[in-house]
């Protein structure tokens, strides 16, 4: 009767990969030969390693769940045809016919790791002038217990006895071309040519463990929302101690209380009371990099803008800074008393905008009428 690998690890048949890995790690720590030298315990340790080798590999697990034993010598065999054990596609047929399939060779256990990405929030002034930030990232790193090899301390990977280190097995298959010899990856070693009889208890044979690291990232001036900064080799370390992938830091610019960014231009609004200092008086505006004097000329209307050239965001790829656009908003009093209304009428007369009754033309309003409408909330 076939071994019940689920029972060996003490997990349900619908257990997730995470549950299987946790169960193996727990048992491996209890039954490891360095901890418990009892010969019976060592046999039990071999059983949990075999169970984990099958259940942690999707292909082997599928074969096992269908009633096969992927660790047996004949477990990976198959009948002819185009299904399992036969030809997967036309290139397999041509490889078999011309004898090229056996030239594939074993796969390397050392592979490049996956890329990773995190989001980093920065302030507007940091985006404008650049900065340096320390970030924390959670990625896979090389297991220090096995140095990325995946084997328990004191053990090592062994040559696969099924394929004898070739990484592939051959079989005779019948097709419309007749009987041909075809090769495919060894089901026992998955094409690696070696097997790990005793996986590392710390990383469960993966050669990697999760870790939190602190990295320093330099943010150049001019970055915008969505800009990705690449840190080569700082992503996930590869299986078998392979080189790490890249880490991408995606910039997210936080809203500013005063300035709004549109491309590389900055925009802000300056409020000027109608009854305040004369419009031509210079005013000081606090920008991202200090105080700036702006000159609002006489006659400037609400809604007009004053550009400050070169006071925007420096372009990411170099060059001068763009503009800071100052939008002027002229405010009027919310309510007029009798004296204020009289003064406005006098001003309208001086400007020649108050006309006698009967001379008013549709579509034309004097200064007093326009201001009064504004004060009363009418447009």
Swiss-Prot record:
GO terms for cellular component: cytoplasm. It comes from the Bacteria. Coiled coil: none annotated. Belongs to the DnaJ family. Residues 351-379 are annotated as: Disordered. The lineage of its organism: Bacteria, Bacillati, Actinomycetota, Actinomycetes, Kitasatosporales. Homodimer. InterPro entries: DnaJ, DnaJ_C, DnaJ_domain, DnaJ_domain_CS, HSP40/DnaJ_pept-bd, HSP_DnaJ_Cys-rich_dom, HSP_DnaJ_Cys-rich_dom_sf, J_dom_sf. Zn(2+) 1 binds at residues 143, 146, 200, 203. The gene is dnaJ2. It comes from Streptomyces albus G. GO terms for biological process: chaperone cofactor-dependent protein refolding; DNA replication; protein refolding; response to heat. Keywords: Chaperone, Cytoplasm, DNA replication, Metal-binding, Repeat, Stress response, Zinc, Zinc-finger. Binds 2 Zn(2+) ions per monomer. This is Chaperone protein DnaJ 2.
């Amino acid at each position: 009767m076939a071994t019940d690998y689920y029972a060996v690890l003490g997990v349900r048949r619908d257990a997730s990969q995470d549950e299987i890995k946790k169960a193996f790690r727990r048992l491996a720590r209890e039954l490891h030969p360095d901890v418990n030298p009892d010969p019976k315990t060592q046999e039990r340790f071999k059983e949990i390693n075999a169970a984990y080798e099958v259940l942690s590999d999707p292909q082997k697990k599928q074969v096992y769940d269908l009633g096969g034993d992927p660790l047996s010598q004949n477990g990976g065999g198959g009948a002819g045809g185009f299904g399992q054990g036969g030809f997967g596609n036309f290139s397999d047929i041509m490889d078999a016919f011309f004898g090229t399939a056996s030239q594939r060779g074993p796969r390397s256990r050392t592979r490049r790791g996956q890329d990773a990405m995190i989001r980093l929030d920065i302030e507007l002034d940091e985006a404008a002038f650049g900065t340096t930030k320390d970030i924390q990232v959670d990625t896979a790193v090389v297991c220090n217990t096995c140095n990325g090899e995946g084997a328990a301390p004191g053990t090592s990977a062994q040559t696969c006895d099924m394929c004898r280190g070739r990484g592939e097995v051959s079989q005779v298959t019948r097709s419309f071309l007749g009987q041909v010899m075809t090769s495919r990856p060894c089901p026992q070693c998955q094409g690696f040519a070696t097997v790990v009889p005793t996986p590392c208890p710390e990383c469960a044979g993966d050669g990697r463990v999760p870790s939190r690291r602190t990295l320093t990232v330099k943010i150049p001036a001019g970055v915008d929302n969505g800009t990705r900064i690449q840190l080569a080799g700082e992503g996930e370390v590869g299986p078998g101690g392979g080189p790490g992938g890249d880490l991408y830091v995606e910039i997210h610019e936080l809203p500013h209380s005063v300035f709004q960014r549109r491309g590389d231009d900055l925009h802000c609004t300056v409020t000027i009371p109608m009854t305040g200092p004369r419009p031509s008086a210079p005013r000081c505006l606090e920008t991202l990099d200090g105080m700036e004097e702006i000159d609002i000329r006489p006659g400037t209307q609400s809604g007009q803008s004053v550009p400050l050239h070169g006071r925007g965001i420096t372009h990411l790829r170099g060059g001068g800074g763009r503009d800071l656009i100052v939008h002027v908003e002229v405010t009027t009093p919310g309510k007029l008393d009798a004296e204020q209304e009289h003064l406005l009428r006098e001003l309208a007369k001086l400007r020649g905008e108050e006309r006698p009754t009967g001379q008013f033309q549709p579509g034309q309003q004097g200064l007093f009428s326009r201001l009064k409408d504004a004060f009363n909330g009418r447009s």
